[in-house]
């Protein structure tokens, strides 16, 4: 729960020794905040901590709607580093395992064995909970140099995800083999982006 801001404009390097407060709600960094602003931010932080404490009291209890329907709450993950939060927060499983992060963490195409181990670790750690794995969604906002994708004016609608998988079949088959092998170690479903 550490707030972070990206693509910040007008960052100055002469902030050494100055207090800075990151406000993730409003995407702001306050340098040398006024006492009133600091007090306001501290108050909001305390309110957040109270809300988290209330949510913690719900852990382990059924997720039931006002009309009596029980629902499962699933988490989204990018890999093994997120599994602890799934377990800690009592998620019913994983609704989206973004496998492109396996690719983003590599400097070359990940091997079948490398992928198998990554998927197996997650599945074993969460078994018997369901894990919905999305095949590689590279392209648009997530790219890797080794794939050598051409620039597109509108990459969100262009050559990405399943389109890449269907034209680079060796790449796709490697991932599918790794997923099929790993499926023996947990409750896995596969979705295609």
Predicted regions and their residues:
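Acidic, glycine-rich flexible loop/linker segments
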Residues: 1-89
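Conserved alpha/beta-domain cores
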Residues: 52-193
